[in-house]
Each structure stands twice: as structure tokens, then as C-alpha cells.
Amino acid sequence: MLSTDFEYPLWESLSQVCGIDEAGRGPLAGPVVAAAVVFPRHFRPTGIFAKLDDSKKLTAELRDELALAIRESAESWALGVVDAETIDRINILQATMLAMNLAVESLGSTPEFLLVDGNRFRPVLPIPYQTIVKGDSKVFSIAAASVLAKTHRDELMTTSAAEYPEYGFEVHFGYPTARHVEAIARHGRCAIHRQSFKLRKLGEK
């Protein structure tokens, strides 16, 4: 079970500690989505939060349940979404940084400290931060952000599946599965595909 033990030393002197994570760096289609989550100072998770973990390790049903609990319990939360066209224009790393910063800037108030999943971050606002490799499986606030980012992105891709039914976005959410690669080979790419993400299997360079 993830606890808020990582946040507690920060809460001794700060009240606005924010967890940040993203979803959708690797897919061939769709946006990259980041979430920023601030829990109340000295928050102690109970109940369904005992099941919180890196969103990739959770079932879709549990992610949805946790997302609801996170939104209800958080002091504030926000999302940042960067579309495929922008990803192609500025590259996926820059797009991920942009999504994270958009999420932070969309919070109701400016956090005092950021806990960021991964090993790099480029803040727009002058806020102190710490990057944590595999933070979504170590830090409560980051895991919560990973769930919000993943569930929102999945919802966006499911909506896109209705517009582009031939690709099966509601199943693989844009990731490079065999079914998705086959659909691209048969139909070409659609408007939400990342043109800069090339497939060697299809001879793309």
C-alpha cells in the first residue's frame, strides 16, 4: 500500500505539495496527458486508496473507482493535454513537459513544491521540484496523478474510436499493438496519429 510518508516531511513546512505524472508518451496516436494533484496537508489515505498503485498495474475498473476517489479527496487537481499535431511539431519530450506545466498552471492555486515522475522536468513557474524515477509506484501523490492522467486519456481515445472505428482505439488506446499496426497498414494514418512516430515494421523512416 502506498502511503503519504514521502509527502509528510514536506508538509511539515509546506501545505501545497503537488504530484505530477503523464500518460501517453509511447502511443502512435492521440495526445499525451498529464495530471497534477494536491492533497490536503497531512492527508492519510484509507479505504480504496489501499489499492492505489502505478496506473499501469491496475485494472480499468479499479482505475475508474480510484479516479473518482482522488477527485473527491484532493484539495485540487488539473489536467494538461497536448495533441498529436503538437507532439509532431515539438517532439514528445517537449510535449510531455508542456502537458505537465499546463496541468500545474491549471490548478486553482500555485503549489509550493512539485513531486514529478521520471528523471527530468522543466518547470515554467518558479516552483521547487523533485523528480523521482518510478515515482508512480513509490509516491502517493504521483500515483494519484498517474491514475487521473491515464483514465482521462483512455476516455479521450474511446471518444476518438467512435470517429475512427477502423483502428480500434477503444482497445489499445493508440499503443503499437499488432492490431493497431495492421490497421495502419490497411487504412493509413488518421488525423490523430503522430506522424513523427515511424513504424519500422511498415518500412517507415
Swiss-Prot record:
Keywords associated with the record: Cytoplasm, Endonuclease, Hydrolase, Manganese, Metal-binding, Nuclease
* Transmembrane segment boundaries: none
Q: Which Pfam families match?
A: RNase_HII (PF01351)
Q: What class of enzyme is it?
A: hydrolase
Q: Give GO MF terms, alphabetically.
A: manganese ion binding; RNA binding; RNA-DNA hybrid ribonuclease activity
Binding annotation for a divalent metal cation: 21-22, 117
Domain (RNase H type-2): residue spans on this chain? 15-205
State the source organism's domain of life: Bacteria
Recorded family membership: Belongs to the RNase HII family.
What role does it play?
A: Endonuclease that specifically degrades the RNA of RNA-DNA hybrids.
| Protein name (Swiss-Prot/TrEMBL) | Ribonuclease HII
Q: Which organism is it from?
A: Chlorobaculum tepidum (strain ATCC 49652 / DSM 12025 / NBRC 103806 / TLS) (Chlorobium tepidum)
